[in-house]
Structures are given as structure tokens and as C-alpha cells.
Amino acid sequence: MISIITPFHNCPELIPDYEKAVQGAQVIVIDNASEEDTAVKLQAMVGRLSNDSKYIRNDVNQGYSKANNQGLAIADGEIVVFLNSDIVSAGDWSDRVKNAKKGAFYAATTGVRVVDGEAIRYLEGWCLFGHKSDFEMIGGWREDWEGMYWEDNELCWRAEMAGLELKQVDLPLLHYSNYTTSRTPGAYDKRPSNQALFERIVRQDKNNG
């Protein structure tokens, strides 16, 4: 089984395309304190999806990482997909996810951050997947981030430190980059401090290694 975990915060206009993209999987929606009309629409969507799908509502926005960990804790699938809500599918992509092997994380797109002159590769978190046991092995998503950004960088850094591979796969998915972030008040405010935290983590790990 594949479990798809998606935090939602408002933006109900994304629901139709999202629903089309996740057919056939267990879908776990973490509603991060959306407005009531959005919450009603999200619950209705989950009701139309697989019988194994689940809806959790947070009264307060818990942020991206905590929401992902909430979903990870209740996922029934051997493979879990952390998927953003602002996506469109151009075809079936489940077979490529089912081929995921243990010992690696996968994503549709990758990026690079530079810390002290060293390029550090990461998988972009808008569609990131792997075996549930591997995510549990590294402790899931780090939760002490404020605002948004750099969560996927740290997760992938920790994964590589634990011996996991980072692999890019071609998926028929389109991501509306920053669509939801730009509509979340304060989302960018902590980006510089999150970057500084990530850089401290990398330096500490290198010094301890």
C-alpha cells in the first residue's frame, strides 16, 4: 500500500486537481487549521477517496514538519509519499512510487544548497517518498522549525548521514511552486533563521564526524 500524506491550510481551489492526482492510494490529510468551509470540503474529499483514507484537523497550524509526522504516525502503507497540495497530475504515477526500494528516498525534483563552500544535494519536499521504515529509522521530520523552508534540506542531510541514498525520479506531476506558501501569513519570516539553523546542523555533524 502507498500512503500519501498532505498538510492542507486553506486554498480549497486546489482540491479538485489534488483529488484527481491521489486516486487509488491511502490519503492522509492533515488540516492545519483551515477555515471552516475548507475543512468541510477536505472532509468531503477524504470521504470520496479510498476507505483507508484519513482526515486529521489541527485547531492550530502545527507547521509542515509536525503535520508530516502526524501523518507518518498513522500511515498504513509500506511506502509513504509526502505530497504538497498545490500539484496537478498529468498521468498515473503510482507504479513509479511502488518501485521504491528500501535504503533510499526519492523525489520528483532536487536542489543544492552550499554550506561553507560545499554543495549539499537534497530532494525537494513537495513530492518526496520512500519506505515508512526508513523515515522512522531517521526519526521523521525535525519539528523545531519556525515558519517554512529548509525542512527538506535537513531531512535529506540526516538521511545521507544515516546511509540512505537520494534519488530523483521522473513523475508526471506539476508543482505550483510557492502557491500555498505565498498565501500563508508569515511563511517567509523565519527563512533566514531556518537557513542558519541548517548550516549549524551541518557544521556540527561534520565536527562530530
What are these regions (language model features)?
Residues 106-119:
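Short beta-strand-to-loop element that shapes/binds the nucleotide-sugar donor at the catalytic cleft/hinge
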Residues 21, 31-42, 87-88:
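A conserved acidic beta->alpha catalytic loop
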